[in-house]
Curated annotation (Swiss-Prot):
A motif (Nuclear localization signal) lies at residues 118-121, 701-704, 902-905. GO terms for molecular function: double-stranded DNA binding. Its main location: nucleus. The gene is Sycp1. This is Synaptonemal complex protein 1.
Length: 997
């Protein structure tokens, strides 16, 4: 794109109604300087809120303007008319009557133009008042928005206080839940009797599975929707890119067309200049012909004098001959006698006479013809001299008018230079005020900044459009004035044509600017549409998140209902416990161990449930924040829509005005053609009048020489005025370039804001991805918890079966087996698990024997030992604690599988028959190789019996190592997602830069 040429803005001043009497047509220099001063007024006022002081200053400048103080030009015109009439007072009175008619027309036109100027002044004052009202309304709106922002901040503080209170309430609820869980642990003592209710848990498990399947399906749908949105965004970006290219090509095409038009206009101007030079050459030729015709006329007069003398001589000869003829006749009468002798002489004489008479008649005819030709030549010469005299008179009048106008222009230039200095000072003050306002506006919040920037754009567009309308009006007036002046002065035609071309080029530039402004408004509309689409997408995503949250809440409500039912069951079971306590006193020590382990399981499950509840609350808070942000954005988008609609309406109205102005320009061109025709008719009339004005030829020749001297002086003055005008134009161009730099800065700020918006959108997308990863982790944890529940249920069923088997075995066994058990207690080595050592089992049995148990307990132990000895090797029984193999497998879910047994790993080994609940008896860390050697005695595990004690519940422990590894995995995933989000941001920023470059 080539840089646009600097141009000057012409804006008409505001008139006071009391000063207008008539409008005087001015020269090009005066008009241009006048409108430049007014242009500075408008540039100083642009972009700053108008006040009454500025209006008063403008009005004082208008009142002191010399252009309007000297509008009453009627006496001047009368003087010109009187001076013109004194040159041809000796002529006919009809010419005075014909000159009075165009003067009356001129007066009527001048009064019409004065009325138009009054109307224009009233409309400008009303527009200024409207602008002041709009500025006051905008200030009120800004203050209201500030108050609303303060209220929102107070509300946010209140909400934060409420959140803290709710957090404290949640802590209290957690304490209450811990207390209730202690009661729930008592229920686990009677889990054997509550086996019938496991079917309900299985049914609920299936429901939860279905819920999780639905959640997975929803997540997959979300992923597909996000991919579709990404594809749509890329398609929209490509469409925008293509549209921008098309608009760029159109603009280039329009520039080429306008350049062609400019070249055509320049060619026309050159042709007009050539025509004017040709006319001047014709004038010179005519003057030369006049002088030649005068010389010829003098020569012809001398010839006519000579011919008159010849005619007189011939007439005398003729008279002499006639007298001789009479004498001869008398002599013939006297001398009849001598007739015969003289007949021959007479015949000869008659012949000679006839010949002489014929020759004389031919000479007379030739003389008559020469007289007629000379008379025609004389009449033609008289006509040409008359036309030339009239032309000289008109030129003298024009020269006098030009001298008067030059004097007026010099006075106006001096006054306007002083006004220009005042306007520059005023403009500087306004620029300082603008900077102060900008610093104040920068302190507002980001949302207000965005809104104000859009409003500034709208105001700038309005201001530019108003300037364009003012410029169009002023240029139409200038074109009209120039057209009138073309009819008055042929010598200034070149200057006026140049000004007309400059005005047309400036109009074309302003049209291009209008097109660019419309393109910018279209771009803003497209960006607003994109924002609306993104907001709608965000709303849909929020709805989906809300549905997920509602489902989670429903699940929580179900769990709470289950807890309530369990509490009711607790109350019922307490009554039963009092009756059953007597029976279970013997088995109390064993049950305590089971209860401790089950409590630990329950606590771990509760801890995980609390974590999930906290995560759900965090997600709810995030969703609420997103909702608020989307509501704010939707409000901003609606406001932008309304502003864009208003801008569209204004642009359409201004386009209509431009079309109307173009129609007016066409009409003015037609009027120019008609005025040219009238001018030609006037020339013909003047040529007729020249025939009457032969007397003033000699006077005009002297006056022409004086006029030439005055013309030379006027040309010098015009050159000086042009130089001054060029200096002032350069100053105006510098001011316009300053404004252009300011506009470029504003555009850069808009681009940076667009980048910030895009960064925000990318951050939101990365936050969404992080939330999805957290959801997937929570689901995995829930799946692991479900598996633990299933394992516990299976172990409960096994305990039931073992209880039934023990009851049957006690009835069948004899007292002999009991005696054998008493004799050899140490010989029987029980193996409670495939991974418990014999030494441990012996120590546990000895401790149980020495602890002062009741006889029933001993009998049951002996019976169980007898049954083990009598039964085959294939019988298996459940143990109180979970096997080391199962614990090892659970840990291996979170750890990578090793290839060899030589790697040393720590495994938990449980004390089965511990009577006390001390920490030393519960856990002991043992290496994997030592355990395998102790359990199998360096043999295969197939050679050993798998013995399980009755009424044992499994314990699901999650080691601290597994928790730390799970946390490290989470961090790794978050880091990966962060790097992916950064890469996406960089890629989108590059694409945005490509779009805007």
């Amino acid at each position: 794109m080539e840089k646009q040429k600097p141009f000057t803005l012409f804006v008409p001043p505001r008139l006071s109604s009391s000063q207008v009497s008539a409008v005087k047509p001015q020269t090009a220099g005066g008009d241009s300087n006048y409108f430049k001063t007014v242009n500075k007024c408008t540039e100083g006022d642009f972009g700053v809120p108008l006040t009454m002081s500025s209006l008063s200053k403008n009005r004082e400048n208008i009142d002191t303007d010399p252009a309007f103080q000297k509008l009453s030009i009627l006496p001047m015109l009368e003087q010109v008319a009187n001076s013109g009439s004194c040159h041809y007072q000796e002529g006919v009175n009809d010419s005075d009557f014909e000159n009075s008619e165009p003067m009356s027309r001129l007066y009527s036109k001048l009064y019409k133009e004065a009325e138009k100027i009054k109307k224009w002044k009233v409309s400008i004052e009303s527009e200024l008042k409207q602008k002041e009202n709009k500025l006051q309304e905008n200030r009120k709106i800004i203050e209201a928005q500030r108050k609303a922002i303060q209220e929102l901040q107070f509300e946010n503080e209140k909400v934060s206080l409420k959140l803290e209170e709710e957090i404290q309430e949640n802590k209290d609820l957690i304490k209450e839940n811990n207390a209730t869980r202690h009661w729930c642990n008592l229920l686990k003592e009677t889990c054997a009797r509550s086996a019938e209710k496991t079917s309900k848990y299985e049914y609920e498990r299936e429901e939860t599975r279905q819920v999780y399947v639905d959640l997975n399906n929803n997540i997959e749908k979300m992923i597909l929707a996000f991919e579709e949105l990404r594809v749509q965004a890329e398609n929209a970006r490509l469409e925008m890119h293509f549209k921008l290219k098309e608009d760029h090509e159109k603009i280039q095409h329009l520039e080429e067309e306008y350049q062609k038009e400019v070249n055509n206009k320049e060619n026309q101007v050159s042709l007009l200049l050539i025509q004017s030079t040709e006319k001047e050459n014709k004038m010179k030729d005519l003057t030369f012909l006049l002088e030649e015709s005068r010389d010829k006329a003098n020569q012809l007069e001398e010839k006519t004098k000579l011919q008159d003398e010849n005619l007189k001589e011939l007439n005398e000869k003729k008279d002499h001959l006639t007298s001789e003829l009479e004498d001869i006749k008398m002599s013939m009468q006297r001398s009849m006698s001598t007739q015969k002798t003289l007949e021959e002489d007479l015949q000869i004489a008659t012949k000679t006479i006839y010949q002489l008479t014929e020759e004389k008649e031919a000479q007379m005819e030739e003389l008559n013809k020469a007289k007629t030709t000379h008379s025609l030549v004389v009449t033609e010469l008289k006509a040409t001299t008359c036309t030339l005299e009239e032309l000289l008179r008109t030129e003298q009048q024009r020269l006098e008018n030009n001298e008067d106008q030059l004097k007026l222009i010099t006075m106006e230039l001096q006054k306007k230079s002083s006004e220009l200095e005042e306007m520059t000072k005023f403009k500087n003050n306004k620029e300082v005020e603008l900077e102060e306002l900008k610093t104040i506006l920068a302190e507002d919040q980001k949302l207000l900044d965005e809104k104000k920037q859009v409003e500034k754009l709208a105001e700038e567009l309005q201001g530019k459009e108003q300037e364009l309308t003012f410029l169009l009006q002023t240029r139409e007036k200038e074109i009209h004035d120039l057209e009138v002046q073309v009819t008055v002065t042929k010598t200034s035609e070149e200057h006026y044509l140049k000004q007309v071309e400059e005005m047309k080029t400036e109009l074309e530039k302003e049209k291009l600017k209008n097109i660019e402004l419309t393109a910018n408004s279209d771009m803003l509309l497209l960006e607003n549409k994109k924002l609306v689409q993104e907001a709608s997408d965000m709303v849909l995503e929020l709805k989906k998140h809300q549905e997920d949250i509602i489902n989670c809440k429903k699940q929580e409500e179900r769990m709470l209902k289950q807890i309530e039912t369990l509490e009711e069951k607790e109350m019922n079971l307490r009554d039963e416990l009092e009756s059953v306590r007597k029976e279970f006193i013997q088995q109390g020590d064993e049950v305590k161990c089971k209860l401790d382990k089950s409590e630990e399981n329950a606590r771990s499950i509760e801890y995980e449930v609390l974590k999930k509840e906290k995560q759900m609350k965090i997600l709810e808070n995030k969703c609420n924040n997103l909702k608020k942000q989307i509501e704010n954005k939707s409000k901003n988008i609606e406001e932008l829509h309304q502003e864009n609609k208003a801008l569209k309406k204004k642009s359409s109205a201004e386009n209509k005005q431009l079309n109307a102005y173009e129609i007016k320009v066409n009409k003015l061109e037609l009027e120019l053609a008609s005025t040219k025709q009238k001018f030609e008719e006037m020339i013909n009339n003047y040529q007729k009048e020249i025939e009457i004005k032969k007397i003033s030829e000699e006077k005009l020749l002297g006056e022409v020489e004086k006029a030439k001297a005055t013309v030379d002086e006027a040309v010098k003055l015009q050159k000086e005025i042009d130089l001054r005008c060029q200096h002032k134009i350069a100053e105006m161009v510098a001011l316009m370039e300053k404004h252009k730099h300011q506009y470029d800065k504003i555009v850069e700020e808009r681009d940076s804001e667009l980048g910030l918006y895009k960064n925000r959108e990318q951050e939101q997308s990365s936050a969404k991805v992080a939330l999805e990863t957290e959801l997937s982790n929570i689901r995995n944890e829930l799946v692991s918890l479900k598996k633990q529940l299933e394992v516990e249920k299976e172990e409960k069923e096994k305990l039931k079966m073992e209880q039934e088997n023990t009851a049957i075995l006690t009835d069948k066994k004899d007292k002999k087996i009991q005696a054998s058990l008493l004799e050899s207690p140490e010989a029987t080595s029980w193996k409670f698990d495939s991974k418990t050592t014999p030494s441990q089992n012996i120590s546990r049995l000895s401790s149980s024997m020495d602890s002062g148990k009741s006889k029933d307990n001993r009998d049951s132990l002996r019976a169980s030992a007898k049954s083990i000895l009598s039964t085959t090797v294939t019988k298996e029984y459940t143990v109180k604690t979970p096997t080391k193999k199962s614990i090892y497998q659970r840990e291996n879910k979170y750890l990578p599988t090793g290839g060899s047994n030589k790697k040393r790993k720590t495994v938990f080994e449980f004390d089965v028959n511990s009577d006390s609940s001390e920490t030393t008896d519960l856990l002991s860390l043992v290496s994997e190789e030592d355990i395998s050697n102790r359990i199998y005695n360096n043999n295969t595990p197939d050679s050993h019996l798998l013995v399980k004690t009755p009424k044992q519940t499994p314990l699901s422990l999650s080691t601290p190592a597994s928790f730390t590894k799970f946390g490290s995995l989470k961090k790794m995933r978050e880091d990966r997602w962060a790097t992916i989000a950064k890469i996406d941001r960089k890629r989108r920023l590059k694409e945005a830069e490509k779009l805007f470059t």
